[in-house]
Structure formats: C-alpha cells, structure tokens
C-alpha cells in the first residue's frame, strides 16, 4: 500500500515514527509531508525519516489561513501523483480534504477535546477518527476509542529504553534532583487566550532553593537571566531527560503526559481545563497535578516543593498505568492494514486481543 502521513507538530513525529518504520518494514510505501513547526523538521532528520517540507510558518491568523490553503494545494498535487491507499494525520483538515478529493481512505487521530474547529469541520468529514478512551466527546459512527495515549506510541516500554548517559551529558550528579520545565508560546489556534506560569523567574528560584537543578525547554525566547537554564541536549533526547527527572513542571499537556507515562510526576500549569488525559492521569493514576485557577502559580510551586521533599513510589503508579494501556503504535499499524477488523476488536471487548 501507499500511505501518506502529514506532520504538523514535533509531537506528530514522535507519534508516527515507529508506525512509519513498521509499515515500511512490512513492505508498504510511506510518504511523509511536513510543515515547519518548532523542531519538527529537526526531529524528522534526527530519526532518518524521509520527508518533504511543503509549508512554512505564520504568526497571525490571516497568514495561517494563507499558508493552510497553499499547504493543502501542494499536498493534493503530490498525493494525486502517488495515488495513496490511506492518508493519516493528527487532527489535520488537509488530509480529510485531499483524501475526499482523491477517493482514498483517511485516518485522523486526536486527543485534544478543546479543538473546537476540528470537531465541527474536520472530524465529521473523516472516514475514521481515533482517540484514547479518556476522550469525552462522542464524534459519531466514524469514531473509535482505544485504551492508550498518543504518548504510548513512542514511550511504551516496548518502544522506548531510556539512556542513562543523559545525566553525565548534562553534568548532573547521581544524587542531584532534576526538574524539567516546559514553556509554550500560546500561539496554537486552540491555545489562544490561555495562560500558564505567571512568573517564570520566581518558579525557577523557588525550585532551585530546594536544591533541584532546573532545565527549561521553551517554544519562545527566555528572559536573559534564565538563558543558562535552557535545554542544551539534542531534541530527540528530551525523553531520556524526562525519564531521569524527579519532576516536570510546565504549560504543556503533551509533555506532562509524556512525563507521567515515564513515571515522572508532572505538574501542569495552564488555564486550559477539561482535558481528558489530564483528568485521567490525575484522578486515576495520581501522576499529574493540574492547576488552572487564579492561584495556579502559587499552588503549583507549593505542590512541586512537596513532591521534591517527598518519597512517593511513582514507579508503582506507572506500573498500574501500563497494565491498563496498550502500545498505541500497534493500534495505528493495525488500522492502516485492516481498519474493519481493528475497529471491531476495540469496540467489542468480547473479541480476543489482536
């Protein structure tokens, strides 16, 4: 089969990279088209994934609309030459539009409940929409839920083995506590109007006062006084760093989830509320702590200090999570090769595991 995958964000590279490798190993031709977004292209190159960049960046809504139109036209022209059997993406309208024009099958993955535009104008047109079980909305007959997370497509123990050398690379002493902090730009369409950590310098100062080392990864520029805390390792090593960390504090639900499935407690500071993955990881597994109200900054720092001073068994909480969840990459590849059977397995618990 010919399979087209589109990449809109660095997280999409992680989500699809193992599926791309497996599908190619099974004899399928996988064609990857990407748009520039943060370190997405760097990751594709780091993992050796052949790809073509067909869209750039924009910082305002008119610019984003123009780039989206150009992107979809370029995607259509390339897909028409390929004649794909399947096109897949994460929450991306271009794949749905182009697959409809070409008469091929599309698969759209999502785990973002507050993406209102997609729910209204993308998912109803898709052949198949796939989400984790925590996803609270019912999209329709084309919707199938699976027991996992996007992040388990690349951080399931069958897919990821942490490299302990990361500690030496960043000069971290064996008994030194590490906090990874993630700051987002709030420019994504579904993030506009939301906020996170009120005072970054204050957060860093108070965490370091506990004896922890703070490393920051940010979508934008850091204040000059914090530039020496910025992440200095290759972007594909971030998950080794999260595994080694004693705590994650940040504004990214994706990275909070990554930390949680690796067994690192995560504090999410964001005014975005109602995310199913955060709710499940908080209420069922106790691996994420979220703060969204007007006192979010102070409450988050207080919780961070208590975690650094505590002795909870986070590894046991991770074991409980993994016992309940699947390797998401297996689900992705199964859908590509046999959609009907795969969907039946996940919709009918009486059927045997496949």
Task: Label each residue range with its predicted role.
Residues 107-109, 118-131, 242:
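A conserved, positively charged/aromatic
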Residues 70-75, 221-255:
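Donor nucleotide-activated moiety binding/catalytic core segment of transferases
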């Amino acid at each position: 089969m010919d399979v087209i995958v589109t990449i809109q964000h660095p997280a999409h590279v992680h989500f699809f990279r193992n599926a791309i490798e497996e599908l190619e190993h099974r004899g399928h031709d996988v064609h990857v088209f990407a748009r520039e977004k943060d370190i997405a292209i760097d990751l594709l190159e780091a993992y050796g994934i052949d790809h073509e960049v067909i869209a750039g960046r924009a910082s305002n809504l008119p610019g984003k609309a123009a780039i989206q139109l150009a992107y979809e036209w370029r995607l259509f022209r390339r897909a028409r030459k390929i004649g794909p059997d399947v096109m897949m993406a994460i929450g991306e309208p271009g794949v749905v539009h182009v697959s409809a024009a070409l008469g091929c099958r599309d698969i759209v993955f999502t785990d973002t409940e507050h993406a209102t535009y997609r729910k209204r104008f993308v998912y109803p047109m898709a052949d198949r929409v796939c989400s984790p079980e925590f996803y609270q909305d019912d999209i329709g007959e084309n919707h199938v839920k699976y027991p996992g997370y996007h992040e388990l497509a690349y951080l399931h123990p069958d897919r990821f083995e942490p490299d302990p050398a990361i500690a030496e690379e960043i000069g971290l002493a064996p008994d030194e506590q590490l906090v990874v902090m993630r700051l987002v730009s709030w420019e994504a369409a579904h993030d506009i109007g939301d906020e996170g950590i009120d005072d970054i310098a204050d957060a860093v100062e108070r965490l370091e006062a506990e004896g922890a080392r703070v490393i920051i990864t940010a979508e934008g520029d850091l204040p000059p006084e914090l530039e020496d805390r910025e992440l200095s390792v290759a972007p594909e090593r971030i998950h080794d760093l999260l595994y080694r960390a004693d705590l994650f504090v940040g504004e990214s639900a994706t990275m909070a989830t990554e930390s949680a499935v690796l067994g690192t407690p995560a504090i999410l500071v964001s005014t975005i509320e109602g995310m199913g993955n955060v709710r499940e990881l908080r209420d069922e597994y106790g691996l994420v702590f979220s703060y969204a109200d007007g006192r979010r900054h102070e409450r988050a720092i207080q919780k961070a200090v208590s975690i650094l001073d505590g002795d909870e068994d986070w590894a046991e909480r991770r074991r409980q999570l993994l016992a309940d969840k699947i390797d998401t990459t297996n689900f992705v590849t199964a859908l590509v090769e046999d959609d009907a059977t795969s969907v039946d397995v996940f919709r009918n618990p009486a059927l045997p595991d496949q």
